[in-house]
């Protein structure tokens, strides 16, 4: 069984200290008094322990931001999701928020416009995040597009689209898969999708003014031809008004951003996304952007990039020193 993770704003500071000094902090019970959620794929009947951060000094790394460039494309006015390509070095995939045509855009890390890829067979009600992950063909990386926005909490179901990662110069990609998702607790607002690059497991993080962020999971081996109810994992308490606006998962690190901070977890070898989110995150101060929602990890986890909504916004690079 997996306990809900509740990290009050002040408590996170002590968790970061514990992580850097080798201490271990245990997650608290669900703040809403709910039952203990079940970890996906776990047959254990005992709570999963919170583990210490594995890399010495991880929380003490100086994550210094620098402007890598500016977004050139005049079509990118409401960037909400980002993903760094593993196959095409230096390519960043971006997409717009609600009200835009279904399309993804390729830039390089300096913001140079490399092309627009239209996706005419997919719907785009409120795309909020994107991720790179595995799919049916093990030799191919896939772009996951999270149509999970629901400001009014009125959507009975949301969608996650998946396409093979295209070449940046291709203008149209037809087809694609769509996974229809429901939540066990009813409609939620969400802007964060994490996809495990190892097995395609997915975690959706909700968004709330309280900062209490519900987490839901979907197994990577689901049949995408039928709807699925996500599994409730628990919650993160990021602090009042700390809204989860985007995230990314790699083989060594996981990040979830708010408008002001980035919460970063280091992954132990073989750990699942759910297990990783039980460990202590580090808090990294983000540059206050116009409306910062997108974040993307580099393939090796050594750096991440953020970018905001708005025309010709800067691309910020955070590299560990």
Give the positions of each predicted feature.
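Bacterial N-terminal signal peptides that target proteins for export
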Residues: 1-9
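Sec-dependent, cleavable N-terminal signal peptides
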Residues: 11-14
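C-terminal motif of bacterial Sec signal peptides marking the signal peptidase cleavage site
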Residues: 17-19
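Sequence/structural signature of beta-propeller domains
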Residues: 21-23, 40-41, 47-321
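Bacterial Sec signal peptide processing site at the extreme N-terminus
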Residues: 22-31
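Extracytoplasmic/periplasmic regions of membrane proteins
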Residues: 31-45
């Amino acid at each position: 069984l997996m306990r809900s993770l509740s990290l009050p704003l002040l408590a996170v500071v002590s968790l970061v200290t514990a992580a850097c000094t080798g201490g271990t902090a245990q997650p608290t019970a669900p703040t809403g008094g709910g039952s203990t959620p079940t970890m996906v794929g776990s047959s254990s009947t005992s709570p999963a322990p919170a583990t210490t951060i594995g890399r010495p000094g991880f929380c003490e790394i100086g994550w210094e931001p620098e402007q890598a460039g500016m977004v050139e494309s005049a079509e990118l006015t409401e960037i909400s999701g980002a993903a760094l390509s593993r196959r095409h070095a230096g390519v960043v995939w971006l997409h717009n928020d609600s009200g835009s045509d279904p399309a993804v855009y390729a830039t390089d890390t300096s913001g140079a416009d490399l092309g627009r890829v239209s996706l005419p067979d997919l719907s785009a009600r409120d795309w909020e995040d994107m991720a790179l992950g595995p799919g049916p063909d093990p030799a191919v990386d896939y772009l996951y597009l999270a149509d999970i926005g629901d400001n009014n909490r009125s959507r009975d179901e949301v969608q996650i689209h998946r396409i093979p990662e295209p070449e940046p110069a291709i203008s149209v990609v037809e087809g694609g898969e769509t996974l229809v998702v429901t939540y066990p607790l009813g409609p939620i607002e969400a802007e964060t999708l994490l996809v495990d690059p190892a097995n395609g497991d997915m975690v959706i993080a909700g968004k709330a003014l309280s900062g209490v962020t519900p987490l839901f999971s979907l197994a990577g081996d689901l049949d995408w031809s039928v709807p699925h109810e996500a599994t409730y994992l628990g919650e993160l308490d990021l602090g009042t008004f700390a809204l989860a606006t985007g995230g990314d998962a790699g083989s060594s690190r996981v990040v979830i951003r708010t408008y002001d901070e980035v919460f970063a977890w280091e992954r132990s070898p073989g750990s699942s996304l759910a297990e990783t989110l039980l460990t202590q995150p580090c808090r990294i101060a983000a540059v206050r952007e116009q409306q910062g929602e997108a974040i993307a990890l580099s393939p090796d986890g050594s750096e991440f990039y953020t970018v905001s909504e708005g025309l010709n916004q800067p691309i910020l690079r955070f590299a560990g020193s």
